[in-house]
UniProtKB/Swiss-Prot annotation:
Its EC number is 3.1.3.11. The gene is fbp. It catalyses: beta-D-fructose 1,6-bisphosphate + H2O = beta-D-fructose 6-phosphate + phosphate. Keywords: Carbohydrate metabolism, Cytoplasm, Hydrolase, Magnesium, Metal-binding. It is found in: Cytoplasm. Its cofactor is Mg(2+). Its main location: cytoplasm. GO terms for molecular function: fructose 1,6-bisphosphate 1-phosphatase activity; magnesium ion binding. This is Fructose-1,6-bisphosphatase class 1.
Amino acid sequence: MTTLAQYLNTNAASPALNDVITTVTDVGKTISQLLRKGALADILGEAGNQNVQGEDQKKLDVLANDLLLDALAKNTHCAGVASEELDDAIPANAEGSLLVLFDPLDGSSNIDINMAVGTIFSILPYQHQGKVSENSDFLQAGNQQLAAGYLLYGTSTVLALTITDNVVMFSLDPDTNDYVLIEENVTVDADTSEYAINASNYRYWRAPMQQYIDELIAGEIGVRGRDFNTRWVAAMVGDVHRILCRGGLFTYPFDTKYANKAGKLRLMYEANPMSLLIERAGGGATDAVNRILDIEPTDIHQRVPVVLGSKNEVDYVKNLHLNYAEK
């Protein structure tokens, strides 16, 4: 039985990376405990304010964010922290060598109905040790990530992590409070018959995405010649976890629902870390035209369309968009 601590000691590229991942996952234990208490800990309901994204914050959004910020500020290897919940990145320790980005509680609308939520994190190198970090230091393409992962708080608490060229999974043992390795080489099947999308936005999508979903709905009587099933957790972390476990496709495509927003999902806090996990498990991740991990960010809260999961299906969606652009 291999614990997370043992795995990191053997596989982490540096003691600094080991320590920062440990800090994040230790906070995950606290968040997991709070979620188990639910209403008994008075953590349900609205916090009464909005985040930088214009979204209403839940009480646990704020609490999870504060727990991560406080813990990382005390970590000497962390030079700065950027959160989906805050306007700007926060400097930590100028001598640190790492930057941490996170979505403290993805899918927080699920909290009050006792459904899956999670914490997503990304770790980048810091290039200016000795100087106070600022927003621009975080503007690195996803292919520069040193580590990425998520904690899924469901019927059990699961950690998915990549620090090498593969993806591993751990489960939090409630008896020992240790993360225990349960899968050491996660792979995503190239083909799938499951897809996840919020179909209520159909009228706002571009024509190739509408065509794609029309084909899936037509199933065996359409051009695809086989049936597909829809799955939707309303939390990216839950949908991506399902894909890592049994394949599938997840997309939150470009839409015109809100002006000046290319998509719903944030590049730095959601798309980049999830894309790294999916690609290293053998899947694909694109904005429907470009590889997500190659996108050069211009803002820490930049939004992008996302299509990720089983590679053959991702490639199919990308080809539909490319063919449409050539017409």
